[in-house]
Design a protein with these regions (language model features):
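Alpha-helical transmembrane-bundle signature of multi-pass membrane transport and export proteins
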Residues: 1-271
Length: 271
């Protein structure tokens, strides 16, 4: 009975993509990694505010993390098309673990300064610029074409669920143990996903075909393709506007929660 119910759910909804072992492992372990990102993100804001009590420094840290994302995302997308995505994923996730663990260590040992935060934020931004296109490009290599729509929908759902629950999970750890342990927990959250990357295989990609092309030509063709389609062009504009004018509030929440609402920054940022 339960098997028939499960089969029905798998067939008639986006959950059917979980029939594929490797995709299911990546998504479930990837949720842990996504939650770890929010431990880092919330902790970074709180720590910046505790060190400086400056809205300007909150902005500096946000810019330090965003500039690599803006500049290197096209390069990351090109690498995801030209090289083995699984190897890239392993290397990038290892770098993320190292950066987050380093942030935990320097915070716990009391070595943290605003300048150290800037350096580590830049490093994390670099990993994010390479990870985002690899993460998205891996999904089509984990399921057959018939289940691709369901896989993309489920991937987006779980990713946004982590965006909602990650800060809520980080808040009690920040409140009870502090920022350093929160970073340590965040680094640990990446480990299950890192292990899973050695247990899966990706379907064949076109990496070899793309490897012979010049990287700059590949990037230019990507921009031409994106802006030659009206739907994609307007979508990029919407994303750019929301990133420029909407993200600022998220990056300043630690200061806003204390200055405007007289709340502990840990509570305000988590909310």
């Amino acid at each position: 009975m339960f098997r028939s119910i499960r089969d029905m759910l798998m067939t008639k909804s986006s959950l059917r993509a979980l029939r594929h072992r490797d995709f299911a492992m990546v998504e479930l372990a990837g949720w842990s990694a996504a939650a770890g990102f929010w431990f880092y993100r919330i902790g970074l804001q709180v720590l910046t505010w505790e060190l400086t009590h400056s809205g300007a420094w909150l902005g500096i840290i946000a810019v330090a993390e965003s500039i690599p994302l803006f500049l290197l995302l096209p390069v990351g997308g090109t690498l995801a098309d030209r090289f083995d995505r699984l190897i890239l994923a392993r290397l990038i996730q290892l770098a993320v673990i190292i950066v987050t663990a380093a942030l935990a260590v320097v915070t716990i040992l009391g070595w943290i300064t605003p300048l150290v935060l800037v350096v580590l934020a830049v490093a994390h931004g670099v990993t994010g610029a390479f990870w985002m296109p690899v993460r998205l490009a891996m999904v089509p290599n984990l399921v057959p074409r018939d289940d691709l729509g369901a896989a993309v929908a489920l991937h987006a759902t779980l990713f946004n669920l982590a965006r909602f629950l990650g800060p809520a999970l980080a808040a009690p750890i920040l409140a009870v143990w502090g920022v350093g342990p929160a970073f340590a927990v965040g680094a640990a959250c990446y480990i299950p996903f890192f292990i899973v990357l050695f247990l899966i295989k990706l379907n064949n990609t076109d990496a070899r075909a793309e490897a012979g092309r010049k990287m700059l030509d590949h990037i230019r063709e990507g921009f031409v393709y994106a802006f030659s389609h009206a739907a994609l062009k307007y979508l990029f504009v919407i994303i750019l506007v929301s990133a420029v004018f909407g993200r600022a509030y998220m990056d300043l929440l630690a200061g806003i929660s204390e200055v405007v609402f007289s709340r502990d920054p840990k509570e305000g940022v988590a909310i």
